[in-house]
Amino acid sequence: LDVSHGHGGVLSKRPVVLAVVSDVHCGSTLASCPPEGVRLDEGGKYLPSIVQRWLWAAWEDYWAQIRALCKAEHAALWVVLNGDSFEGQHHGTTQIVSANPEVQAYLAARIFGVPKALKPAHTFIIRGTEAHVGPSGATEEAFARSIRAERDKDSGRWSWWHLRLAIHNVRFDMQHHTSTSGNLPWTRPQAAQRLAFRIWSEHKLRDLDAPHYAFRSHRHIYSD
């Protein structure tokens, strides 16, 4: 079975573990923060809250499980960061560690250094929301270039608005934004089903093979 992406180039017959995370929001006071905190430009220091320390522990635990799975399956690791990896400075929020981009860049290096240490075979960066990552996903594009993420060969960009992968004949479809929602108690359980049907029907109307799995983020709600 072939492992391929982009236009179907053969990569490997090795098993693959695909790890997808999103909305990490590096720089938010409600996002993960390393236990040593981060030094501020003025000489002070920001230390993580109890919630942030818990998030950091959960983050490390997740990647430890991924490492164990890769080892058990003798699998290659592919990582997808599905948008809003940075918090930015938006909507007059006070819930940021610092408005200094360098502070958020340091936090991103520490936070995403955890999966980087696992030496993934491929890393894909998906662009998120303008309010968080700037016009045209500028912050995530710069970050993707800095870590030499997988490049979109068609556009030459280091990050992606829409990523389609084919891994061992299994099709994946990745975007940050979703086209449906369901916030009411009686509509929330059906949001994923509505989105699945929309994705399937849009592909069929264009005579395309629908993905086996589609990932959408942004809503901060788990639904399957």
Residue ranges and their predicted role:
Residues 1-103:
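N-terminal active-site segment of His-dependent metallophosphoesterases
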Residues 75, 90-92, 101-213, 219:
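Conserved catalytic scaffold of divalent metal-dependent phosphoesterases
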Residues 84, 218-219:
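Conserved H-loop
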Residues 221-223:
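Eukaryote-biased recognition of electropositive, low-complexity segments
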